[in-house]
């Protein structure tokens, strides 16, 4: 185990929609990497139970995607509450990174943070105020060197742990191709 203030916390959520005021978190996963993006540990992958009335608020894209992946069924069968998910995730993070030092890392991570702020504020407070958002590099690459984007593709399973692994791989790709480090 390598507890360090240099470690990075990667998070991904799956939600019933895009508005934290009306939609809910249905899956959370986390990974801790070192500063060189080597995976040190994978946290719990948790389907968060939500009642049928919350699942009914999903649009067609969410319903189709989360049903096809098996996530809707996992959510229905889950006994994990939002608070349980917070407690289990923090318990994992405390073994690897001190509170308040790691930026929240991921792809379009601002959206996830909005949901954490609304539905899991205790977990949101575990992160530094900064973001490490891979999608920022993607947007800059799309504008300044679009041919580089052809060299990386995602599976797009929209399962939280898979999405984190892809985000880490994508950042490694940009480091090697754009930054040449």
From Swiss-Prot:
Matches recorded under NCBIfam families: PRK05359.1 (NF003765)
Similarity field: Belongs to the oligoribonuclease family.
Domain Exonuclease: 8-171
Superkingdom classification of source: Bacteria
SMART domains associated with the record: EXOIII
Alphabetical keyword list: Cytoplasm, Exonuclease, Hydrolase, Nuclease
Predominant cellular place of this UniProt entry's protein: cytoplasm
One Gene Ontology CC term in the entry: cytoplasm
InterPro entries: Exonuclease_RNaseT/DNA_pol3 (IPR013520), Oligoribonuclease (IPR022894), RNaseH-like_sf (IPR012337), RNaseH_sf (IPR036397)
Enzyme Commission identifier(s): 3.1.15.-
Function per UniProt: 3'-to-5' exoribonuclease specific for small oligoribonucleotides.
Molecular-function annotations in GO: 3'-5'-RNA exonuclease activity; nucleic acid binding
Protein's name in the database: Oligoribonuclease
Active site: residue positions: 129
UniProt record, GO biological process: DNA metabolic process
Coiled-coil region(s): none
Chain's gene name: orn
Location in or out of the cell: Cytoplasm
């Amino acid at each position: 185990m390598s507890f360090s203030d240099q470690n990075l916390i990667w998070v991904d959520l799956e939600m019933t929609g895009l508005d934290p005021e009306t939609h809910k978190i249905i899956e959370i996963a986390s990974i801790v990497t070192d500063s060189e993006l080597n995976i040190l540990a994978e946290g719990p992958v948790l389907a968060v139970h939500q009642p049928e009335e919350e699942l009914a608020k999903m649009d067609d894209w969410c319903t189709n995607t989360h049903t096809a992946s098996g996530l809707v069924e996992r959510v229905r069968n889950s006994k994990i509450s939002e608070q349980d998910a917070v407690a289990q995730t923090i318990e994992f993070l405390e073994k690897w990174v001190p509170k308040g030092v790691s930026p929240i890392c991921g792809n379009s991570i601002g959206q996830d943070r909005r949901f954490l702020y609304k539905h899991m504020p205790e977990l949101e407070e575990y992160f530094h105020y900064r973001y490490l958002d891979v999608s920022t590099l993607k947007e800059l690459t799309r504008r300044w060197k679009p041919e580089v984007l052809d060299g990386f593709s995602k599976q797009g399973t929209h399962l939280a742990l898979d999405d984190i692994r892809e985000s880490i791989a994508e950042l490694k790709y940009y480091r090697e191709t754009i930054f040449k480090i």
